[in-house]
Amino acid sequence: MFRRGGRILNRRIFGAGISAFRVQGRKCASDLSKALASGPKFSDFLKGDKEEQLKPEEAYELEENVVLPNGSVHKRLPSWLKTKVPLGTNFNKIKNDLRGLNLHTVCEEARCPNMGECWGGKDKTRATATIMLMGDTCTRGCRFCSIKTSRKPPPLDPNEPEKTAEAIKRWGLGYVVLTSVDRDDLADAGASHIAKTISLIKSKAPQVLVEALTPDFSGNLDLVSHVAKSGLDVFAHNVETVEELTPFVRDRRANFRQSLRVLKHAKSVSPHLITKTSIMLGLGETDEEIEATLGELRKNEVDVVTFGQYMRPTKRHMKVQAYITPDKFEHWRKRAEELGFLYVASGPLVRSSYKAGEFYLTNILRRRTAAKAQADH
């Protein structure tokens, strides 16, 4: 245990009992090394057993139980974290097409709570789907993510870019998000595969807005450029958490500063791009750390930020440290807007791609309407 600002701090990060040690805002290097060494290893995430997946109430279970004033222990899932069962014609059509084309979505693989809402948008032009490229197996083992992990995933499907573009054209969506697993085993980390998919979508369905949620390409900025110049509208890369918690949350090959460089470089080579990132809350971060993170993102010209509640996917992953209330999410939305972000989506169930089309389009239309009104005066 250590003291920070007069209080004892011993924040437990993983269910396995790893602690994040801090001394007056800085990590103690030796204790950080010990904590990382004793935590889940890359091999612990290889070929995850689906039977370990948690129920929603378990996924949001707190690391430490909250004792209420009457002495009872709080374990019930807050009402704002409950969602409806996915239904709807558009939802079923997208799901069936995915099966027929052997495509994957991060919506399903990451067990997103908003799948039915996004896929079943009020009309096709408002519906959003997030296609996961390069298979369903990642070469990294982040401590928050439920995607399968392997040192040597299966080879890429050379027909995937064409099949993806055809599916998007068939669905008639207004907005599509492309994400991918990390493929550190490939010479270009999959950059050419992602870029080809984007180009084909724009060729087959030029009306579709395309967002790409990319890996960090191990910091190779030439690969970042290749994707950024491929015709997409939104370049997204997630920092996931505050800098102080990054070593505990993300794979050890990921780096907060590296992620900032990726986002800034994408904007520098394609100034028209909207750049976007996402932050999970409830991992044990402090308000000061969130504030500093937002400042760094703006310094690196990031346009859009989203905030959502961390959800634990399996028992091998980190436990939730805190339920962040809707009021607190609203606080961070307002604060981010004050700092100059073009758009902010903030809420307990928001994910990096949550109803991206609706948020993006609504914001752009609002700006155009305001500009027209000003011109008329």
Swiss-Prot record:
It is found in: Mitochondrion. GO terms for molecular function: 4 iron, 4 sulfur cluster binding; lipoate synthase activity; metal ion binding. The keyword Ion transport does not apply. One of its GO terms (cellular component) is mitochondrion. It comes from the Eukaryota. Belongs to the radical SAM superfamily. Lipoyl synthase family. Residues 1-77 form a transit peptide. Pfam families: LIAS_N (PF16881), Radical_SAM (PF04055). It is an enzyme of class 2 (transferase). HAMAP family: Lipoyl_synth (MF_00206). Keywords: 4Fe-4S, Iron, Iron-sulfur, Metal-binding, Mitochondrion, S-adenosyl-L-methionine, Transferase, Transit peptide. InterPro entries: Aldolase_TIM, Elp3/MiaA/NifB-like_rSAM, LIAS_N, Lipoyl_synth, rSAM. Residues 123-342 form the Radical SAM core domain. Its EC number is 2.8.1.8. [4Fe-4S] cluster 1 binds at C107, C112, C118, S353. Its cofactor is [4Fe-4S] cluster. [4Fe-4S] cluster 2 binds at C138, C142, C145. Its main location: mitochondrion. Gene3D superfamilies: Aldolase class I. This is Lipoyl synthase, mitochondrial. It comes from Schizosaccharomyces japonicus (strain yFS275 / FY16936). Pathway: Protein modification; protein lipoylation via endogenous pathway; protein N(6)-(lipoyl)lysine from octanoyl-[acyl-carrier-protein]: step 2/2.
